[in-house]
Amino acid sequence: MKKWEHYEHTADIGIRGYGDSLEEAFEAVAIALFDVMVNVNKVEKKEVREIEVEAEDLEALLYSFLEELLVIHDIEGLVFRDFEVKIERVNGKYRLRAKAYGEKLDLKKHEPKEEVKAITYHDMKIERLPNGKWMAQLVPDI
């Protein structure tokens, strides 16, 4: 079961995702990212975008995944509410393939909040918790 939350971090907003698997934690932190920008509960799954990124480590993989989502948001004006993430290790690198589900931003419907300017490595952590679940977090540039 995945869940997400925002956490206070000085003048910024931290985003944190939890999941039974690493993939679910990545999905949850992506939902948290978009909930910083809009009310994700009002976003419908009308469109899908496929994403593929590779990186040397999990932190770079999370950064690249969220950065790609932010680029799609900026260029196409899409907001997302749900994700299907698959992560595998190939030739010593991590590969992430994902589907992102959402729709075009509607200012009246989606209740815009903050603008996320960039993904950062600030306070980024990806770890397996003592209960066996996974957690991923970071503080984006608002």
From Swiss-Prot:
GO MF term set: calcium ion binding
PANTHER family: ARCHEASE, PROTEIN ARCHEASE
Keywords: Calcium, Metal-binding, tRNA processing
GO biological process: tRNA splicing, via endonucleolytic cleavage and ligation
InterPro entries: Archease, Archease_arc, Archease_dom, Archease_dom_sf
Family to which this protein belongs: Belongs to the archease family.
Binding, Ca(2+): D12, D141, I142
HAMAP family: Archease_arch
Outcome of mutating D12A: Impaired ability to stimulate RtcB ligase activity
Consequence of substituting D141A: Impaired ability to stimulate RtcB ligase activity
Descriptive protein name: Protein archease
Pfam families named in the record: Archease (PF01951)
Stored Gene3D superfamilies: Archease domain (3.55.10.10)
Result, substituting E8A: Does not affect ability to stimulate RtcB ligase activity but has an effect on ATP utilization by RtcB
Function, as annotated: Activates the tRNA-splicing ligase complex by facilitating the enzymatic turnover of catalytic subunit RtcB. Acts by promoting the guanylylation of RtcB, a key intermediate step in tRNA ligation. Can also alter the NTP specificity of RtcB such that ATP, dGTP or ITP is used efficiently.
